[in-house]
Amino acid sequence: MAVPPTYADLGKSARDVFTKGYGFGLIKLDLKTKSENGLEFTSSGSANTETTKVTGSLETKYRWTEYGLTFTEKWNTDNTLGTEITVEDQLARGLKLTFDSSFSPNTGKKNAKIKTGYKREHVNLGCDVDFDIAGPSIRGALVLGYEGWLAGYQMNFETAKSRVTQSNFAVGYKTDEFQLHTNVNDGTEFGGSIYQKVNKKLETAVNLAWTAGNSNTRFGIAAKYQIDPDACFSAKVNNSSLIGLGYTQTLKPGIKLTLSALLDGKNVNAGGHKLGLGLEFQA
């Protein structure tokens, strides 16, 4: 393992088994295109079948690879505009700098962030500064890795309050076929996950979480099976007897269909189950 993942990506393989391939209660459409000059367009829209609320977003991205620059423009149906400029591996190898800003014309709210990330063998370091009206906040994270073992720490410091408002710690072990991840958030929330790639077609995951002072433990298991190169089936269940099912099929190159359902195992005949439909086009 040359470079460890960022703190946010610790345990990502297990989370992906639980989250990818599902879209309960949503009808979703995604479109990705790329022009000849390298300009990338990504648009998405979704409708909530319960609230009938429709949301959408548009993103354009241009990479100036000669100078390690990436320019991104974003817009969503809440009428929030965003601009992101990233420069990577230019000032120093492994160093990534990002300026991220957003503006909402309806409310006049503005936000700006400066994100820095530095990675090299055995180390992944990040520091973000969020410039808020109430006062800047600083979020820092560090992950160390050695022979598959990982240890990470994340903190958030709010200058307006002059105190640390978040303190998280994680430990894990990672190989190509197996991953173990445990974390403690603010000394009160505990979690863990296990990821196992059984073979080329089957992936499994287990997660566990609980809060200090609360006897309610959250537990779930999930699996993803690659039926063939164009189709895969996903399933998951938790200790609340909620059963999730997902099926993804590549109809033709660039067109992908996703069907999903969330069933209440305690009230199978009572209704109230959620269905989802997703279409993804890529050209």
From Swiss-Prot:
Q: Which compartment or compartments is the protein found in?
A: Mitochondrion outer membrane; Cell membrane; Membrane raft
> For the modification N6-acetyllysine, which residues carry it?
K20, K109, K252, K266
The text of the family note is: Belongs to the eukaryotic mitochondrial porin family.
Known partners and oligomeric status: Homodimer and homotrimer; in response to cyclic AMP or calcium; oligomerization is required for scramblase activity. Component of the mitochondrial permeability transition pore complex (mPTPC), at least composed of SPG7, VDAC1 and PPIF. Interacts with SPG7, NIPSNAP2 and SLC25A30. Interacts with hexokinases including HK1. The HK1-VDAC1 complex interacts with ATF2. Interacts with BCL2L1. Interacts with BAK1. Interacts with RTL10/BOP (via BH3 domain). Interacts with amyloid-beta and APP; induces VDAC1 dephosphorylation. Interacts with TMEM41B. Interacts with BCAP31.
Protein name per the record: Non-selective voltage-gated ion channel VDAC1
Which InterPro entries does the entry mention? Porin_dom_sf (IPR023614), Porin_Euk (IPR001925), Porin_Euk/Tom40 (IPR027246)
Q: Organism classification, top ranks?
A: Eukaryota, Metazoa, Chordata, Craniata, Vertebrata
Which residues does the annotation say bind ATP?
K12, K20
Keywords, ordered alphabetically? Acetylation, Apoptosis, ATP-binding, Cell membrane, Ion transport, Isopeptide bond, Lipid transport, Lipid-binding, Membrane, Mitochondrion, Mitochondrion outer membrane, NAD, Nucleotide-binding, Phosphoprotein, Porin, Transmembrane, Transmembrane beta strand, Transport, Ubl conjugation
UniProt free text on domains: Consists mainly of a membrane-spanning beta-barrel formed by 19 beta-strands. The helical N-terminus folds back into the pore opening and plays a role in voltage-gated channel activity.
Q: Which reaction does it catalyse?
A: chloride(in) = chloride(out); K(+)(in) = K(+)(out); ATP(in) = ATP(out); Ca(2+)(in) = Ca(2+)(out)
**Membrane topology note:** Multi-pass membrane protein
Q: Give the binding site residues for NAD(+).
A: L242, I243, G244, S260, A261, L262, L263, D264
Modified residue annotations for N6-succinyllysine: K20
Which organism does this record belong to?
Answer: Sus scrofa
Phosphothreonine modification, residue list: T19, T107
